[in-house]
Structure formats: C-alpha cells, structure tokens
C-alpha cells in the first residue's frame, strides 16, 4: 500500500534519479514562480496544507518520509499556495519545531541528500540568527558529504 504522503513526494522530487537528475527535473518547481504551479499545489495538496497548518497529520511524523512531506506542507507549499500573503509563512514555526524533532531522531540522515536540502532550508527561513546558523552548518556538512561530482549542484542551494 502506498504511503499517504507519497504523491506529494513524487510531485516534489519525482519518482527516482540522481540528485542532479532530480534537480534538473524539479528545479523550476522548487525555485520558480509560476501561477500554474501554485494552482497545481493548491488543487492537489491544499487540503493537506490546511490540515498541517492546523496542527494535523502528526501521524506522518512516525517515518522519515512522512516527516519530510509534513515539513514540505508547512514550509514550501504555503509559499506557493499563499504567495504574496502573510499566510505564506504561517507554517514556519511549526516546521522549525518538527525539523528539530526529526533531526533529534536522525530522520534527516535517513533521507536522500537532495531531500535533506529542504529540511535544512526550513532553518534558513527562520528570523532567528542562531536557527539560521544551525541550518547553514547542517547544509555545509551535507555539501561536504557529497561526491565531488555533486558538490557544485549542492553548493547552488
């Protein structure tokens, strides 16, 4: 049986591939601004975003992939669905809390490196300099762990 969060992870990261293949395929989704992408995010995942923002979907925290999906629902998707509105950032505090909890459980180490980018990015979105520095430190460590051939890709994030 497919995990409930799998459609979100497939949409965000694709179904497979190396970090460079995933980034080439999904980079515009991640870092582009397109009304069509924002609409697709709202139509496909808007209900989940609202549930996550309301404190729901906590059962997803039991597995690293579910944790990642929940973090995306709180941090990345609101920035698309509620673009140019304060609600775009309404999941940031909960996302930071969940990221800290997941890191304490070593969930980040169980994800693919390209997935970990979006975990550490949550800390970089913080208004708190100490939290930002934590994200930067973890990201520097992630880059250093990559094969030489992937370091340039990861250095761009």
Regions found by a protein language model. Give the residues of each.
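Intrinsically disordered, low-complexity activation-like regions
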Residues: 1-84, 89-157
